[in-house]
Amino acid sequence: MKEFWNERYAEEAYAYGQEANDFIKAQQIGTGLKVLCLAEGEGRNAVYIASLGNDVTCIDYSQEGLQKTARLAQMNGVQVTGICEDLSQTQLQQEHWDLIVGVFAHFPAHVKEHIWPQVFAALKPGGQLLMEVYDQEQLRFGTGGPQHLDLLYGKEELEALLTKQFNSIQIEKIYRDVHEGVYHNGAAATLQVRALK
């Protein structure tokens, strides 16, 4: 899988565009926050959040993606710290982040089991998790995202993962047009998540 992402991000164009995800842009993200972006790819969300005046780190296991993140950050006059790590093995620092972001961060079951408890532990008290992911219904649209059901999310699955850990969660299933580069393009079924520790 790592080779797949390195090949995709080795293309000259930004696979998912250079603009941040619409859900992320619609949030009231403050300034001066320590922010972690998971499976951030080419850095479009990290760069946007850094442009608001935040200290942003992103983790991805594609070196090609992180190189494009650095290039995009330079083009936008901001700094983003990139860490090349496999999220199935990473150990996140506890109570370190004000905000953790996961945009279309889709993982196999064993990675989900590893990473989501760590995300909760890594947030400071009062910290926030923001996510937009493809719903399982996305398979019928064929406009982006994984083509395997087990890599997609169901609302009930996310509720089960997050309810026992977060003090407040809001999960909304929506149908919207996603236009993010050439690989996420068209009508889609997504889940948008806001969770507070």
Indicate residue ranges for each PLM-predicted region.
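Conserved SAM/SAH-binding beta-strand->alpha-helix loop
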Residues: S62-E64
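A short acidic, Gly/Pro-enriched loop at the edge of an enzyme's catalytic core
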Residues: S88-L99
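A short SAM/SAH-binding and catalytic strip from SAM-dependent methyltransferases
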Residues: D98-E113
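A short glycine-rich, Lys/Arg-flanked "PGG" loop and its adjoining helix->strand segment in the class I
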Residues: E113-P125
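Conserved beta-strand signature within the Rossmann-like core of class I S-adenosyl-L-methionine
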Residues: G126-Y134
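Acceptor-substrate binding/catalytic loop of class I
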Residues: Q138-L158, V182-H184, T190
